[in-house]
Amino acid sequence: MKSDSPVHRESHTGCQSPCPLRCLPARLEGSTKRRLAANARERRRMQGLNTAFDSLRKVVPQWGEDKQLSKYETLQMALSYIMALSRILSEAERYSRTDPEEWTNIQYDHIEEEQCLSYMEVRCPRDCDRYLPQTFSH
């Protein structure tokens, strides 16, 4: 019994066998391979994204060491940090034309002496040097 239904004709397309059921495993196998390949690509993409977030977390200031920042919090902190650095640079440029010492005094007026010493001892996080050339290579 041959069926002329659209389903039978579609599943039979390109198949040399008189029975469409014989073609089904080959089609499923091809579909499964494509799905596995797509899953592997997505897994690599997500691993790359997570690695990038881990790298960003290492260079963005964090208030506490008790918990890892979420991706959203990491992006928010990075944005705040970039804006603060940008503000500092624009203020420094503005004051450097008139009175550089005044700018320095403004920056350090609110810092106690012992805090200032601890800030001066702060070192760049491990692997920091690795990111700077990439960031400012333009």
Curated annotation (Swiss-Prot):
What GO CC annotations are associated with the protein? axon; nucleus; perikaryon
Q: Which InterPro entries match?
A: ATOH7_bHLH (IPR032663), bHLH_dom (IPR011598), bHLH_transcription_factors (IPR050359), HLH_DNA-bd_sf (IPR036638)
Entry's localization field = Nucleus; Perikaryon; Cell projection, Axon
Mention any additional remark. Inhibited by Notch and ESR1.
Gene Ontology MF annotations:
DNA-binding transcription factor activity, RNA polymerase II-specific; E-box binding; protein dimerization activity; transcription cis-regulatory region binding
Biological role: Transcription factor that binds to DNA at the consensus sequence 5'-CAG[GC]TG-3'. Positively regulates the determination of retinal ganglion cell fate and formation of the optic nerve and retino-hypothalamic tract. Required for retinal circadian rhythm photoentrainment. Plays a role in brainstem auditory signaling and binaural processing. Regulates the differentiation of olfactory receptor neurons. During retinal neurogenesis, activates the transcription of several genes such as brn3d, coe3, cbfa2t2, glis2, elrC and xgadd45-gamma.
The protein depicted here goes by the name Transcription factor Atoh7-a
What Pfam families would the database entry show?
Answer: HLH
Q: Where is this chain primarily localised? A: nucleus
Origin superkingdom: Eukaryota
GO BP terms: namely:
axon development; neural retina development; neuron fate commitment; positive regulation of retinal ganglion cell axon guidance; positive regulation of transcription by RNA polymerase II; regulation of transcription by RNA polymerase II; sensory organ development
Enumerate the spans annotated as bHLH domain. 33-85
Keyword line: Cell projection, Developmental protein, Differentiation, DNA-binding, Neurogenesis, Nucleus, Transcription, Transcription regulation
